[in-house]
A protein has these predicted regions:
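Helix N-cap / beta->alpha transition motif
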Residues: 1, 72, 176-181, 223, ...
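Assembly/oligomerization interface modules of large self-assembling protein complexes
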Residues: 1-68
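Short conserved micro-motifs at the rims of enzyme active sites and ligand-binding pockets
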Residues: 40-43, 81, 186-190, 218-221, ...
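Active-site and NAD+-binding cores of ADP-ribose-processing enzymes
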Residues: 50, 100, 218
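Alpha-helical scaffold segments that mediate packing/assembly in large oligomeric complexes
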Residues: 56-154, 270
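Extended oligomerization regions of viral-like shell subunits
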Residues: 117-246, 250, 256
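Low-complexity, Gly/Ser/Thr/Pro-rich intrinsically disordered linker/tail segments
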Residues: 248, 269-270
Length: 270
């Protein structure tokens, strides 16, 4: 049911921001790191400049998200289309909440590795659980000048990959905050312009997104394109009309395979 994922991206701004990709159900997928430069030289000179690519096999898309809904058979009297919409709506919200939670705070054990978890080389993973990141700094938004300095540090942190390679992150950094804290920031940077319209503007066009899964007084900065949020295969909803026959219920079971993990330690910060 493709409409479920369309609704996810419109109703949950965080899921829209990371750009979930449907890859099809595959057991492994490849990642690559490229190096080398094209080299200038004289006409008729020798060909130089070797380009290298290192491929690595990532873990399988093996995290399964499941949910089920049991509804009275009598509901069919209201029409099968209505019943389907009722079931889809419930599953839609359950999957949206579960995916958002996992992509933000998931510990990696039978679920995606969230933005708040360490993924750098040498990270000690115990029984499938990735350790939590420690706070890398403090954002106060105390004044315009202080805010510029604080956000400059955030952008500079994300502008270099873990392997030391520079990265252009202009317009690519998002700050994920609890809805309560978002209003404190908006209040500080909302003003009335010459046209009599209130506008909210932050340095460097920083994008702020709210999520209930971010603890109060904490913020997560991330570069969305550097987090792999993959959906494996189509959502599968099965109907069982005999499983709960004595209870006079129809059972709808849904499952979806997903994978989530930052490309390296510098993709996100707490």
């Amino acid at each position: 049911v493709d409409e479920i994922f369309e609704d996810l991206t419109t109703e949950h701004p965080f899921l829209a921001s990371i750009g979930m990709r449907t890859t099809g159900l595959r057991t492994k997928f490849l990642k690559s790191e490229t190096s080398g430069l094209a080299v200038w030289g004289k006409i008729f000179g020798e060909i130089k400049g070797q380009l290298d690519a290192t491929f690595s096999e990532e873990e399988s898309i093996q995290n399964k998200l499941t949910a089920f809904v049991a509804v009275p058979k009598d509901l069919e009297n209201f029409g099968p289309v209505w019943v389907k919409r009722f079931v889809v709506t419930q599953i839609e919200e359950a999957f949206a909440v579960a995916l958002e939670s996992a992509f933000i705070i998931g510990d990696g054990k039978d679920k995606p590795v969230g933005l708040t978890r360490k993924v750098g080389k040498g990270t000690n993973v115990v029984d499938g659980v990735y350790p939590e990141k420690v706070a890398s700094g403090t954002l106060t938004f105390a004044s315009s000048k202080v805010t510029v300095n604080e956000l400059t540090d955030v952008y500079k942190y994300h502008s270099v990959k873990e392997n030391g390679k520079p990265l252009n992150v202009a317009g690519e950094v998002t700050l994920l905050v609890n809805p309560t804290d978002a209003w404190d920031v908006k209040k500080q940077y909302t003003s009335l312009n010459a046209n009599g319209v209130y506008v909210t503007a932050l340095p460097y066009n920083l994008n702020i997104i709210e999520s209930l899964f971010v603890p109060e007084k904490k913020a997560i900065s991330y570069v969305a394109k550097r987090y792999d949020a993959l959906i494996g295969g189509a959502l599968n909803i099965s109907t069982f009309d005999q499983t709960l026959a004595f209870e006079d219920l129809n059972l709808y079971a849904a499952k979806q395979f997903a994978y989530g993990k930052a490309k390296d330690e510098k993709a996100a910060a707490v």
